[in-house]
Amino acid sequence: MLRGAKVMKNIVFSILLSLVSAFAPMGVHAETPNHLDGVIDKYFKGKSLTKSDDITFDVAKRALDGTQVPFKFTANKKYKNISVVVEGNPHQLPGIGSLALTMHPKVAPFTFETNIRMEQDSYIDVIAEDDEGRFFYNQVAIRSAGGCSAGMIYDADAVLKEVGTMKVLQTETRASVFIKHPQHNGYQANLSNYTGLFILPEWHLSSVVVKDQEKEIWSAEFGGGSTSENPVFVFDSPKIKGNLQVLAVDTQGKQYIGK
């Protein structure tokens, strides 16, 4: 009897210890690995990158939902290309990280906000190229998990009915673009289909262009499906003169227009 009580006490102690470890402060956990060299070798091979404080972040260090991780950055100088790489995300191409998007802002400073998927604790790299071909970067570590391979209840009819639906909200200096799209990355399990397709094939936005009275504010190409389902793009711009026009294209070649 005493032996049984002792065993039970040890089990309870082990459970409590596991719970304490799970909710321990971030500083107690192992440091997030930095794979910047692998990212450079995969996407910017042969380029020399200089760290820059002109690229800043406004993010939470931990996100509870790996499928919807808020990510916001500001590029204070003018750059012709800005790439966002999630180092810890899988991708069909070999190497480190998933290139979430490459942007081409026409204004500076440029503040951009969206939600991304994260499969594991990871550094997010923002790598910018100026008009002279010089490359700069900054990075931030965020803790989250399970966002790329998480299963989902998938209603194909509902998705096809709403896909591409847009809403554009704007003030004179700030705008938000909402696009209905499943953003499948090729790793998600279809939990609602027990006899047919189990892994949902890759299907996500491939490009977006935002214009103000035919003058482009920014455009972007997307890769790897690291941008979250039903993406929202929030950005700042100098005085917006008219109603914004948005053209989005996905990996199936479908075009969607919003204004």
Question: Where on the chain are the PLM-derived regions?
Answer:
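Bacterial N-terminal signal peptides that target proteins for export
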Residues: 5-15
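Short secondary-structure capping/junction motifs at helix and strand boundaries
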Residues: 9-10, 27, 134-139
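Bacterial N-terminal signal peptides
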Residues: 14-24
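Sec/Tat signal peptide C-region and signal peptidase I cleavage site
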Residues: 24-30
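A general "mature secreted/periplasmic domain" signal
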Residues: 32-160, 164-171, 176-259
